[in-house]
């Protein structure tokens, strides 16, 4: 049973672009102007069954942050972690820690 579960998790990681597209569809229902990037171990190809799919969400409207989180976590089966921020906060904070070549825009 554990092996099947582990394989399912690894398949989600391999399909991170498809998972990202699913997340983006949900996010766009809430904020049509949102930008989304996948980063982290799945982009580097160094993931395990314990990994998640890190998704950077850039929006001008942080008032919708919790609605976005609730909808994505409720509707997406894959293990994702949302990092929701503004363009300004991305430039001042996230860009210091996430190399540009490890950002995959969805």
Regions found by a protein language model. Give the residues of each.
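Catalytic core of pol beta-like nucleotidyltransferases
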Residues: 1-34, 43-50, 59-106
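Amphipathic, hydrophobic secondary-structure cores in small proteins
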Residues: 53-55
């Amino acid at each position: 049973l554990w092996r099947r579960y582990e394989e399912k998790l690894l398949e989600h990681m391999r399909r991170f672009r498809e998972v990202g597209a699913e997340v983006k569809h949900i996010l766009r229902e809430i904020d049509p102007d949102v930008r989304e990037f996948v980063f982290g171990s799945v982009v580097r190809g160094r993931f395990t069954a314990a990994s998640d799919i890190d998704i950077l969400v850039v929006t001008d409207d942080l008032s919708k942050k919790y609605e976005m989180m609730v909808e994505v976590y409720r509707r997406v089966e894959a293990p994702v972690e949302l990092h929701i921020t503004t363009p300004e906060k991305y430039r001042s904070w996230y860009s210091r820690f996430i190399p540009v070549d490890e950002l995959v825009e969805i």
